[in-house]
Amino acid sequence: MGKTTKRMRMISNQIDRTKQYNIHEAIPLLKDHATVKFIESLDVAVKLGINARKSSQNIHSATILPHGIGRSIKVAVFAQGINVSIAETAGADLVGMDNLAAQITKGNINFDVVIASPDTMHLVSTLGQILGPKGMMPNTKTGTITQNIALAIKEIKSGQIRYHNDKNGIIHTTIGKINFESYQLIENLEALLRALKKDKPLQTKGIYFKKICLSTTMGPSLTIDQCSLSTLVK
């Protein structure tokens, strides 16, 4: 604990929490302070100008990051009939119906994403209280309820992330590992922001991207100067 406290105190002395950092300054700074013994993730928090109390302004969506997130994603698929072989051929880690539902009910959830074909939702819907709080319930908006099982698996395996805002209108997600090249992390961030811009609810007014912060798993959080990002996200 003492070492952690000393490390965080040293980092805190080098970070100006009132400053908005240029993205090309922020990434190297976060890399310099990633000194723990594992490869940390780079996380982003995007404060949006939405009213999260209104369902019409809530965002549930997905996008593909050009450089992935730095780890393999395990996919479970609810499928029956010909979709079983389609899912297996496409690279699903688990495929099933009642057996997969039983595994989930027992709390044995050793996968990251659940995909379901529409004809299996009568079963999947019974698992809502388990999958919902984990953010794993299949959803048409994120493409995880689909007729095209093979495409959904391919997109997820190739670096797709799914995201939704919390009650404060903030999107929290991972955009890669801190050992990525700086340009890869920047391009992943800008891909997310472009996707969020497309997701912008029609009812929102005023500033949409209110605040963008980057942090590593065990490191400090830096507020990003939006002027240093691509004009596509302004």
Swiss-Prot record:
Signal peptide: none annotated. SUPFAM superfamilies: Ribosomal protein L1 (SSF56808). Keywords: Repressor, Ribonucleoprotein, Ribosomal protein, RNA-binding, rRNA-binding, Translation regulation, tRNA-binding. GO terms for cellular component: cytosolic large ribosomal subunit. It holds the Pfam family Ribosomal_L1. GO terms for biological process: regulation of translation; translation. Coiled coil: none annotated. InterPro entries: Ribosom_uL1_bac-type (IPR005878), Ribosomal_uL1 (IPR002143), Ribosomal_uL1-like (IPR023674), Ribosomal_uL1/biogenesis (IPR028364), Ribosomal_uL1_3-a/b-sand (IPR016095), Ribosomal_uL1_CS (IPR023673). GO terms for molecular function: rRNA binding; structural constituent of ribosome; tRNA binding. Part of the 50S ribosomal subunit. Belongs to the universal ribosomal protein uL1 family. NCBIfam families: rplA_bact (TIGR01169). Binds directly to 23S rRNA. The L1 stalk is quite mobile in the ribosome, and is involved in E site tRNA release. This is Large ribosomal subunit protein uL1. It comes from Baumannia cicadellinicola subsp. Homalodisca coagulata.
